[in-house]
Amino acid sequence: RGSNLTSLPLQNVIDLFYVGNITIG
């Protein structure tokens, strides 16, 4: 997780969804 993602709202949402998807299984 780089600081670059923080500056990109869309990328941040995608990253959050990606992490959430892994957590769910």
Swiss-Prot record:
Q: Does the keyword Ribosomal protein apply?
A: no
Main location per UniProt? secreted
PTM comment text: N-glycosylated.
Expressed, tissue-wise, as follows:
Expressed in chorionic epithelium (trophectoderm).
Subcellular location(s): the record lists: Secreted, Extracellular space
Q: What is its EC number?
A: 3.4.23.-
Going by the UniProt record, its keywords in alphabetical order are: Aspartyl protease, Glycoprotein, Hydrolase, Protease, Secreted
* Any one biological process term the GO annotation gives: proteolysis
Q: Which family does it belong to?
A: Belongs to the peptidase A1 family.
Q: What is this protein called?
A: Pregnancy-associated glycoprotein 72
Instruction: Write down the species.
Output: Bison bison (American bison)
Lineage, broadest ranks = Eukaryota, Metazoa, Chordata, Craniata, Vertebrata
